[in-house]
């Protein structure tokens, strides 16, 4: 159900995917055949209508587009499932169906901010951080210098979760999902931008919910930063794990590019083992919704010295030769072999292509795969099954050798 607004380019609009489609894919046996045991779904809460924001290329000449809420990160409700995805019944059907097939469902949860159309903004306008800094400048995208207060955009108020009453209300909303949706855990958006006050309240409530449901929910966070910052959220009072983006970046550098720096990858892997433990459960990704597709980096379709979001808007990025497939298979082998939880971004199992967001969110292709795509999918499945069946890959010692 796309937003009918000509200022939104097609790639930044809704494409029609819904929870029923995820359930159908699960029931068709796709994830089981791939060797996966958990599905992480995008944020499903009711999102804003209409066109918002504006992206322009740096020269402000070739491309500009506003956006729909296709990504799910503009919530206007804390508990209602977006009607475009099928509403609450579709969410329950998905979790019930997943459990019937022995699979788990992780919900992408947005706790840091809301959309300005969220009812909270009328009821409690004082629950946000300040949009303007004391010097009069906008406090937007100040990811590190004002990480607990910065707004993502002017229409996305950041909640002041250091205030106990705000943290109490928002952690209640998150805990509601644990009690009423059937999910098995959370992927928490923008973890480092949220106060520990919230994380400790939420984790305490999830532990209380466990006493009622008998289910322990898994929590994995999203934090870009140093191992010390990432690790500061890992404790019995907060999260179970975070994604290891530092490791992914070094894996891209070593595997995707000619003359890759394997020494850097080894050093970063050893740093992760030192910081998080020899048998940690950090998330090791093949890609995600904030990065250009690995395959398009690996086969040279993308110019790393140019804006890869702009390239996604303006180029018809397709496969360039076979090396991207081979390098994706190498990345899969690596991530399935090191400590941590392998996390396959949809489409990477067939070495899908694309620039940065939104070009990295193309419609999933299940049919009419070429031979290299089929081989990559079979490779992914074989490694996933090895990972879950071989004790050496689950609990063995880790050592690195550069030949």
Regions of interest found by a model, annotated:
Residues 189, 278-321, 359:
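Active-site clefts of carbohydrate-active enzymes
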Residues 4, 8-11, 79-80, 307-320, ...:
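Short, basic, glycine/proline-bearing loop/turn elements
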Residues 1-181, 201-212, 228-230:
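Substrate-binding/active-site clefts of carbohydrate-active enzymes
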